[in-house]
């Protein structure tokens, strides 16, 4: 039978529930358990696919093509399980399914209510996502007390009642502030958030206290007394330099022993050797490189979370401190294409994105990298930008652009593809008037790499599988012209469309761009060959 750990948060948002939950999962996995994770989002959006990065941060794409919360990226980076669409759902999806059942007559004319119909659907989805695992860690988005979260909290209350204390555990993350003016740690916010939980029938078994300093024994005893939680189950979650220090930090306080005792799990001792090696590599780099990330969401770096982490993973595997400088592509445009801020950079990266804002600034950055032999990595839109720049400045295709930015451009080298084959062999179609939500090329797709290409050398194979999230493709009608001008198409999709997947420049020290998102499959234990190769190229450029 699957055991459930429910992780909730109180006082304020953005305390790090996802990291805490993922760290617990990593510890339990190191003890030999088969662990999965679920994220329950209270918003009414069906998924975050159409939400602004400034509102939501990064959209993480699962292997099977679900657009999900960035916390699922943390889950995959901390444990070995691959997330799917079953590992994430929102209020919007729950209501959508319940209403569809009502329309079909599944409820036999009954009045459809939050209890039991909505809560039953939530429980069904939790059990579905947890099936086949020893332990499922379920993170409830939002903050206890929010009206949006109430159906989810009621659902897990019912699960505790139905499954019992030895099969369920509540871990609550709270904020314990230090008031500098008074020189005191304040426990009252934590007392109040637990009071809020108790009012809806939830008693925390573990309290994880988010703090910027070690918790004194007196405060620990006080919280235990007022919150009715064992003193040893008051666990500190302190500020650290790297999120990968968190599993060891929580383990050292015995959190996994508390969990295994309550859930009656007879398992081996934790082995965090791999995590200790990762932390040691992060703390003791032998080299340093500076990489410019040129994008338009740079004011909220959470928009590029997986990408930032993938570069850090590459640093772990090359003993390098990867220092990222975020460059606003709009500022380059406003300053007439001035890219002087790139001159001290060892490499340049242009990430994915949508819309025309800041595009010409990105094109200027690509031009600088190409003309000055600076290692360049383009991802998704970053590949399309590189291709547009090459078409304009090398292939002589004046007016080259993407129809995403200029529907009537003279040379649409990037355009909306209206039909393509999915990974399971079915055919999907779209046009300019199609809904934005769920209409992109999503999830893992097979890619064929050209023998002898830089792509094949990086991956060590001519057949790879990478995740996608995009609506526009390279226009194959222009490929012959671009190839004649020296551009190398190093990879194409395995389907009948032969869509361009990677491009490279043979006469450049290291110039590579891909349509897919390799950052979604990078983790600190293994890294990713593309990012490792990119950081090595930056190191070589620095030495040169």
From Swiss-Prot:
- Annotated CTP binding lies at 13, 146-148, 186-191, 222
Q: Which residues bind ATP?
A: 14-19, 71
Residues binding L-glutamine, per UniProt: 353, 381-384, 404, 471
Q: Which residues form the Glutamine amidotransferase type-1 domain?
A: 290-544
Q: Where does UTP bind?
A: 13, 186-191, 222
Q: Which UniProt keywords apply?
A: ATP-binding, Glutamine amidotransferase, Ligase, Magnesium, Metal-binding, Nucleotide-binding, Pyrimidine biosynthesis
One Pfam family assigned to this protein is CTP_synth_N
Give the miscellaneous note.
CTPSs have evolved a hybrid strategy for distinguishing between UTP and CTP. The overlapping regions of the product feedback inhibitory and substrate sites recognize a common feature in both compounds, the triphosphate moiety. To differentiate isosteric substrate and product pyrimidine rings, an additional pocket far from the expected kinase/ligase catalytic site, specifically recognizes the cytosine and ribose portions of the product inhibitor.
The identity of this protein, by name, is: CTP synthase
Species this chain originates from: Neisseria meningitidis serogroup A / serotype 4A (strain DSM 15465 / Z2491)
Q: Give the gene symbol.
A: pyrG
């Amino acid at each position: 039978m699957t055991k459930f750990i429910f992780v909730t948060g109180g006082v304020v948002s953005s305390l790090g529930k996802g990291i805490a939950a993922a760290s617990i999962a990593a510890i339990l996995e190191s003890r030999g358990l088969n662990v999965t994770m679920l994220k329950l989002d209270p918003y009414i959006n069906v998924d975050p696919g159409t939400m602004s990065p400034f509102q939501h941060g990064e959209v993480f794409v699962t292997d099977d093509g679900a657009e999900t919360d960035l916390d699922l990226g943390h889950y995959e980076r901390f444990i070995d399980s691959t997330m799917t669409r079953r590992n994430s759902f929102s209020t919007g999806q729950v209501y959508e399914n319940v209403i569809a059942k009502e329309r079909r007559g599944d409820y036999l004319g009954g009045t459809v209510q939050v209890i039991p119909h909505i809560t039953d659907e939530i429980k069904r989805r939790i059990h579905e996502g947890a099936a086949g695992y020893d332990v499922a860690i379920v993170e409830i988005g939002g903050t206890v007390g929010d009206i949006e979260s109430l159906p989810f909290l009621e659902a897990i209350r019912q699960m505790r009642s139905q499954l019992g204390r030895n099969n369920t555990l509540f871990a609550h993350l709270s904020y314990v502030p230090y008031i500098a003016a008074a020189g005191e740690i304040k426990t009252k916010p934590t007392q109040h958030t637990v009071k809020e939980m108790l009012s809806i029938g939830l008693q925390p078994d573990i309290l994880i206290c988010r703090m910027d300093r070690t918790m004194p024994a007196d405060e620990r005893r006080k919280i235990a007394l007022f919150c009715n939680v064992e003193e040893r189950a008051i666990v500190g979650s302190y500020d650290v330099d790297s999120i990968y220090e968190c599993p060891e930090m929580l383990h050292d306080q015995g959190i996994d022993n508390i969990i295994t005792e309550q859930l009656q799990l007879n398992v081996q001792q934790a082995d965090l050797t791999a995590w200790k090696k990762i932390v040691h590599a992060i703390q003791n780099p032998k080299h340093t490189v500076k990489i410019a990330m040129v994008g338009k969401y740079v004011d909220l770096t959470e928009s590029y979370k997986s990408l930032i982490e993938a570069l850090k993973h590459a640093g772990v595997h090359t003993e390098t401190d990867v220092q990222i400088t975020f460059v606003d592509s709009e500022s380059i445009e406003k300053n007439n294409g001035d890219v002087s801020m790139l001159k001290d950079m060892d490499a340049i990266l242009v990430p994915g994105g949508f819309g025309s804002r800041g595009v010409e600034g990105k094109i200027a950055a690509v031009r600088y990298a190409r003309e000055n032999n600076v290692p360049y990595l383009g991802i998704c839109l970053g590949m399309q930008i590189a291709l547009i720049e090459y078409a304009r400045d090398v292939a002589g295709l004046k007016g080259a652009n993407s129809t995403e930015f200029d529907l009537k451009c003279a040379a649409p080298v990037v355009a909306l593809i209206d039909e393509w084959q999915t990974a399971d062999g079915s055919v999907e179609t779209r046009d300019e008037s199609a809904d934005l939500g769920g209409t992109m090329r999503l999830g893992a797709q097979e890619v064929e790499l050209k023998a002898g290409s830089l792509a094949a050398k990086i991956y060590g194979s001519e057949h790879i599988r990478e995740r996608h999230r995009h609506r526009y493709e390279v226009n194959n009608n222009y490929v012959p012209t671009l190839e004649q001008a020296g551009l190398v198409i190093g990879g194409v999709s395995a389907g009948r469309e032969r869509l361009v997947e990677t491009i490279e420049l043979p006469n450049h020290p290291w110039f590579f761009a891909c349509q897919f998102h390799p950052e979604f499959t990078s983790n600190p234990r293994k890294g990713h060959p593309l990012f490792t190769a990119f950081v090595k190229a930056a190191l070589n450029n620095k030495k040169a």
